[in-house]
Amino acid sequence: MSIHQTPGHVLPARSAAKMEAAMAVGAFAIGTGEFAIMGLMPDIAQNLGLSEPQVGHAISAYALGVMVGAPLLAILGAKLLRKHMLLLLMGLYALGNLATAFTPTFGSLVAFRFISGLPHGAYFGIAAVVASSMVPNDKRAGAV
């Protein structure tokens, strides 16, 4: 199954529901990854020998990544099929978070959190367009 660039390609209800579920799982992962670090700050600070305010810079780095990545990645991926772009964005997000989990230094923590934030905004924007394009016009708001 592929998602066409042309809006309005209505999928059968079952296929649309599966695609929406997959995108919802991706959105849940991004939301969890964004906020989970706040609860882990004391552990991260202790493991890296940092203060909690220093670890707070990793949260800011993620937000900066979201701000930079949303327009940049949406533009760079404009020629790709949206389905492929969503998969690439989730891959980048997963790699950034995996690297964050094993980071040994403060600098790499901040850098990997920035990388993890890059796909966030573009993913939500593209997923909303895909979700609304898979269903009939009267169901678009609910799909998003």
Language-model features, listed with the residues they occupy:
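Helix-breaking motifs and short loop linkers at transmembrane-helix boundaries and internal kinks
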Residues: 47-49, 81, 102-108, 119
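Small-residue-rich segments within alpha-helical transmembrane domains of MFS-like 12-TM solute carriers
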Residues: 31, 35, 101, 117-125
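Helix-to-loop junctions at the C-terminal end of transmembrane segments
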Residues: 70-82
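Extracytoplasmic
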Residues: 19-57, 70-73
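Cytosolic juxtamembrane N-terminal segment immediately preceding the first transmembrane helix
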Residues: 1-26, 30
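Paired small-residue
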Residues: 92-99, 107-116
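Residue-level signature of mid-helix packing/kink "hotspots" within the transmembrane helices
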Residues: 35, 62-71, 121
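Cytoplasmic helix-loop-helix junction between adjacent transmembrane helices
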Residues: 112-144
